[in-house]
């Protein structure tokens, strides 16, 4: 008699999803899937709106990575009005650096939330710890000083975002061709020196290093478990800049294989020539893949692990030192170990802090050349924007009619890019923890969630559960009859 186990909902991720695992008569895993059960429809909602509303409208997809959607939309609008990089015209240095400042501040803030609030509980307490302990409240009780540092670190990132975009959430600064405001000297000094109850930028870097050391300690104690947990091969993809390394704001899309050979590299405006999307009836989320390789061989991994696989170096000294250690661990090959995503995420927190410090010292942020006026007859009616969001490569593609109203929108978000590899991760973990015995335990079910949480999936808006998980496990026979159900 086959069995069907349901983990519904998956907790401590952004949004709502469930996991379904199918077992055969011998309790071997037949299949395992991540079901995304929410339908948002923002691509349809934005149609008919004026094109200039897109960055403000579509950033409301998420309360966590809204800066990425805002900037991705702004870059697409740069294209539409004829001042985008596709036309060979660049926004002013002040505009680009202001956008980059806010982007890296969000990288720091978002990764801090994911790493410390959602992932560290498993690192400190273990997968088998009681649900009431395995969350941020448990962290407060076990290590209040750590939580205080994390709160201050996240606050600092939020304040930089506010200074750049005008609001802590759903900003208003980026416009077609540039930005509305620069950064004042008073604001700059506030972040550099730690005024008004904020950390200084050097303290931020110190705290980021503490986070990296936390992973090193965890890895040293649990090396075998961490390394063997869902080692799932996949292609890796991210934006690379003119220096041939990861660029979080602009570049070419590069895809590499397990030997770090370049499989494809292309201008992101041509993404439709290279990628297709599969659809499954059991999920509202699509499955992108490289056309020439097909769905099974052409799926990609994006996000911290994908970026650290693709890039050869990082332009900041402390993060570069950490990256060298990361690369040395796999002896030059691609790192496919799912839980090493958290290692990569910790490196990116440090890198973002260092980049923000460099940008704060850049005098271009105080200049007043903010918006580039489009040349005559420059309107193209179509634009594509791509950035590296915290969770991975994010793409916005818009078309508008002669009145400037949007007629088409396609959003390829990082979690969608990771959809296939997340499902493979679920299958791998299910085989290790469920196959052959079928015993349902708290630690076993949470192990599947741990695998998903490593990708920090943003399924819709920010939804985090505290305390005991509202988890339901249902067992069905081959005829689809419910024969057992457990809830807590």
Curated annotation (Swiss-Prot):
Query: A GO molecular-function term, please?
Result: ferredoxin hydrogenase activity
Q: Which GO cellular component terms are attached?
A: cytoplasm
Q: Name the domain of life this protein comes from.
A: Bacteria
The cofactor(s) it depends on are:
FMN; Ni(2+)
Q: Which reaction does it catalyse?
A: H2 + NAD(+) = NADH + H(+)
Q: What EC class is this?
A: oxidoreductase
Residues at which Ni(2+) binds:
62, 65, 458, 461
- Compartments where found: Cytoplasm
The record's comment on protein family reads: Belongs to the [NiFe]/[NiFeSe] hydrogenase large subunit family.
What is the name of the protein in this document? NAD-reducing hydrogenase HoxS subunit beta
Give the originating organism. Cupriavidus necator (strain ATCC 17699 / DSM 428 / KCTC 22496 / NCIMB 10442 / H16 / Stanier 337)
């Amino acid at each position: 008699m086959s069995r069907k186990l349901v983990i519904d909902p998956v907790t401590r991720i952004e949004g709502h999803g469930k996991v379904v695992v199918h077992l055969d008569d011998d309790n071997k895993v037949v299949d395992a899937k991540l079901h995304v059960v929410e339908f948002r429809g923002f691509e349809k909602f934005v149609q008919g709106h004026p094109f200039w509303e897109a960055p403000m409208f579509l950033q409301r997809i998420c309360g966590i990575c809204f800066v990425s959607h805002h900037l991705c939309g702004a870059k697409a609008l740069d294209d539409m009005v004829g001042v985008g990089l596709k036309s060979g015209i660049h926004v002013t240095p002040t505009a680009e650096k202001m956008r980059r400042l806010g982007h890296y501040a969000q990288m720091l803030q978002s990764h801090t939330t994911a790493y410390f609030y959602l992932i560290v509980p498993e690192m400190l307490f273990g997968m088998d710890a009681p649900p009431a302990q395995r969350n941020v409240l448990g962290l407060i009780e076990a290590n209040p000083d750590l939580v205080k540092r994390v709160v201050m670190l996240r606050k600092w990132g939020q304040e930089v975002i506010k200074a750049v975009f005008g609001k802590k959430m759903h900003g208003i600064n980026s416009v077609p061709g540039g930005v509305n405001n620069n950064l004042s000297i008073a604001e700059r000094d506030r972040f550099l020196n730690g005024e008004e109850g904020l950390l200084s930028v050097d303290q931020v870097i110190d705290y980021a290093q503490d986070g990296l050391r936390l992973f090193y300690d965890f890895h040293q104690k649990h090396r075998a478990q961490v390394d063997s947990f869902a080692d799932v091969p996949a292609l890796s993809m991210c934006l690379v800049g003119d220096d041939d390394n990861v660029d979080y704001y602009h570049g070419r899309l590069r895809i590499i294989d397990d030997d770090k050979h370049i499989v494809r590299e292309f201008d992101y405006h041509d993404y439709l020539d290279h990628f297709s999307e599969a659809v499954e009836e059991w999920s509202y989320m699509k499955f992108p893949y490289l056309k020439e390789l097909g769905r099974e061989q052409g799926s990609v991994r994006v996000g911290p692990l994908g970026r650290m696989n693709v890039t050869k170096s990082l332009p900041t000294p402390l993060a570069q030192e950490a990256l060298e250690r990361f690369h040395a661990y796999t002896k030059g090959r691609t790192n496919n170990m799912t839980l090493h995503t958290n290692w990569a995420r910790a490196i990116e927190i440090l890198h973002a802090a260092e980049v923000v410090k460099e940008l704060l010292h850049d005098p271009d942020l105080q200049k007043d050349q903010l918006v580039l006026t489009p040349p005559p007859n420059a309107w193209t009616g179509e634009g594509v924007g791509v950035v590296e969001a915290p969770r991975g490569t994010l793409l916005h593609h818009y078309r508008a009619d002669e009145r400037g109203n949007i007629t088409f929108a396609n959003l390829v978000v990082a979690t969608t890019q990771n959809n296939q590899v997340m499902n493979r991760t679920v299958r791998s973990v299910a085989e290790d923890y469920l196959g052959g015995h079928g015993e349902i335990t708290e630690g076993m079910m949470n192990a599947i969630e741990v695998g998903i949480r490593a990708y920090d999936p943003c399924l819709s808006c920010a939804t985090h559960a505290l305390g005991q998980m509202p988890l339901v496990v249902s067992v069905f026979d081959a005829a689809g009859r419910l024969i057992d159900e457990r809830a807590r």
